[in-house]
Amino acid sequence: MLRTMLKSKIHRATVTQADLHYVGSVTIDADLMDAADLLEGEQVTIVDIDNGARLVTYAITGERGSGVIGINGAAAHLVHPGDLVILIAYGTMEEAEARAYQPRIVFVDADNKPVDLGHDPAFVPDFEIAGAAELLDPRIVAR
């Protein structure tokens, strides 16, 4: 049996641009694509933390080091500059591979620069990591 598993996640990235008239896709900084093991043209799900919108599109490579997260095409009606998003890619694999597979989880700072790379989808970085406090849910930070 094939299983669809979490393969890659870029957590709480800030949308930097939206272009309604582009042909579609999401533009992602090449550094983030590498960190998350995403390929150009790979299917990604975008989850907008601010408004709850979820959509499926494909990744295109943005300028390395730019921090770009650009929403292109019709998705720009749903996701806007300044919104926090989670970018997710899934992989289909045989059960034995799925049980051993470790996804790539990338936490970013307010400028979409990686601050933590890991494999545990339930992990949240601690406060010692530069910029990590901004990544946490404000309800948790207030405790």
Swiss-Prot record:
Residues binding substrate: T57, G73, A74, A75
Disulfide pairings: none
EC numbers, comma separated: 4.1.1.11
Key words of the record: Autocatalytic cleavage, Cytoplasm, Decarboxylase, Lyase, Pantothenate biosynthesis, Pyruvate, Schiff base, Zymogen
Record-annotated active site: S25 (schiff-base intermediate with substrate), Y58 (proton donor)
Cofactor: pyruvate
GO cellular component term, pick one: cytosol
Localization annotation: Cytoplasm
Post-translational modification: Is synthesized initially as an inactive proenzyme, which is activated by self-cleavage at a specific serine bond to produce a beta-subunit with a hydroxyl group at its C-terminus and an alpha-subunit with a pyruvoyl group at its N-terminus.
Cofactor note: Binds 1 pyruvoyl group covalently per subunit.
Keyword Transmembrane helix: no
CDD domains cross-referenced by the UniProt entry: Asp_decarbox
Gene Ontology biological-process annotations: alanine biosynthetic process; pantothenate biosynthetic process
Pfam families: Asp_decarbox (PF02261)
Any GO MF annotation of the entry: aspartate 1-decarboxylase activity
Catalytic activity: L-aspartate + H(+) = beta-alanine + CO2
Pathway the protein acts in: Cofactor biosynthesis; (R)-pantothenate biosynthesis; beta-alanine from L-aspartate: step 1/1
The protein's enzyme class: lyase
Modified residues (Pyruvic acid (Ser)): S25
HAMAP family linked: PanD (MF_00446)
Subunit field text: Heterooctamer of four alpha and four beta subunits.
Functional summary from the UniProt entry: Catalyzes the pyruvoyl-dependent decarboxylation of aspartate to produce beta-alanine.
Homology family: Belongs to the PanD family.
Protein name: Aspartate 1-decarboxylase
